Amino acid sequence: AEDGIRDLVRSRGLGDVYKRQGIGEIKNKLWDPLKRAFADLEIRNNIVIGGAYKDKIFVSFVSHLTGTFINQWLGVPPTNKTIYLRTCHCHQITNNKIIKSYILIDTVDFIRQAGYWPIHKSLGAEGMWPAPITGDGENNSNLDKELSMKSLHQSLTMQISLGTKPEMEPTFSTDNIRYNLINDHEQKKYWHPKMMWFGPSGVGTARGLKGFVDHHQLPFRLTFKERDYNTIGHYVEIGDGNYSMTGGWHSIKSKYGSNHWLGFEPNNVMVEMRVMDFYLHHEGLIRENWVPIDIAYILKQIGVDIFELIHKK
């Protein structure tokens, strides 16, 4: 595998735990501890897509690292049971070699599977993310550039619509905001009636626009009212057939202003969010959206160390 990785490769993931440069450091600090903890580790890909953005080539994945948890990892004691590490990763390719990787492993979901839950109950449903309903996420070989561009355009246009903020209307109650987001907001025209929104552990999964608004979007908007989606921007925006993907490291920076999202008391700390969005475009609309967010890193920024909480239990 090292033949496909340049010496200057950079890997970013798990908050600042694994912000590493060079093959040796990535091997010693990321992969070796993983392989010690999960000796039979293997990867299962649900989505594989690629494309170009700003003259850079990217390949992105929604995967699960699967193995038997036999030795501690990140200070969490082993269970000797199967663990599925939800892993979303995006790699920049130059001359057929990886020069930079962005890796989000859902450590909160890992903690949940290990039998711990030291934070507030998720609003959405917890559980393993399924593969795309169309069954073609890993075997997507559509080279139709027009379709790829159409998919990316749809997801980016939907994201732009999120900049409309009914929560900033001084006369709007929470019920008014909720009604607007479900019934009147521009986003409605982009989402499939049977949409699925697969969120990170700590937030959970939601079905339909109503579920999405109730279990993630409205609480998120009430907590981060001053968020700005556009100033920082993305490091990647790609379309590949009926799929598209965007990512920011970080792409959003805002104050943690209420306890609606994640449940912790507001402290107005400025929070950075590292996030990816993977989209399935089906029947002319966005059917499914997989959204890895580094929740452990967000919690750490507001003064909540989820790994310390485990040891206090």
Predicted regions mapped to residue ranges:
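Short, low-complexity N-terminal intrinsically disordered segments enriched in polar/charged residues
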Residues: 1, 118-181
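Single conserved hydrophobic/aromatic residue that forms the stacking wall/gate
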Residues: 1-18
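A short, amphipathic edge element
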Residues: 33-48, 219-234
